[in-house]
A protein has these predicted regions:
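N-terminal glycine-rich cofactor-binding segment that shapes the pocket for flavin-like pterin cofactors
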Residues: 1-223
């Protein structure tokens, strides 16, 4: 986020979407950081939601213990439970951020020098979020972002993350192997979107495209 804030004033047209590791950060702090970036970039900020399953990363923060699991073994009940917990926490994280961005009404700032009033307190609202991982009362300490709701994105490689994309994101990045799998992934994400009551919301799903430059690795490297 700090790098994006530094880059923002020297750019004009690109969106700035830093990654936030939600497993080891707090949604209140992240929400105001992204809101500030939206001001610095005049409405071009977004956030990419990322979870961490690394015991090494967890040790650096010291907030929680992360089990050592083979996350590629998706049939392992322990892996499924752990992954679902991370993604569930991420969904709550996004919900808190969105509520905090909406906790200031658009005209909450008065900036009346004569009376010394900067805000109309009646236009700031508690969010009163209580979940399994967070309890956040609000409101935010940063005014409503220029966009209102900065763009939320997420990368998904499997069914559980697809649920996060469908239920919480504005943009989803996926990695299909072929066109048939791409259709299956989009169907799964749209189903999750509908189940979350977001069927009318705009959700863009973008797939990675692998480009082969040449049949030979050496020739491809040369190109």
């Amino acid at each position: 986020v700090l790098i994006a804030a530094r880059v923002a004033p020297v750019t004009r047209h690109i969106g700035l979407v830093p990654s936030v590791v939600v497993t080891h950060t707090e949604p209140f702090h992240a929400s105001k950081a992204i809101a500030t970036l939206d001001y610095v970039s005049t409405g071009r900020a977004g956030v990419r939601i990322r979870v961490s399953s690394s015991p090494h990363e967890a040790a650096l923060f010291g907030r929680r213990d992360v089990p050592r699991l083979n996350l590629r073994d998706r049939d392992d009940p322990a892996v499924r439970e752990f992954t679902a917990g991370l993604i569930g926490e991420a969904a709550d994280y996004v919900e808190v951020m969105r509520r905090l961005w909406d906790s200031w009404e658009d005209d909450a700032e008065i900036r009346d020098a004569a009376t010394g009033r900067f805000i109309d307190r009646d236009k700031l609202h508690y969010i009163d979020f209580a979940g399994d991982c967070f309890s956040v009362k609000g409101p935010s300490i940063t005014p409503r972002p220029p966009q209102g709701q900065p763009v939320v994105s997420a990368l998904g490689h499997g069914p559980v993350p697809y649920g996060l994309i469908g239920g919480s994101a504005d943009v989803g990045f996926v990695t299909p192997q072929d066109a048939a799998q791409a259709r299956e992934i989009v169907t799964e994400i749209r189903s999750a979107q509908g189940a979350a009551g977001r069927a009318e919301d705009t959700l863009h799903v973008l797939g990675d495209l692998v480009v082969f430059l040449d049949h030979d690795a050496g020739a491809a490297a040369g190109r």
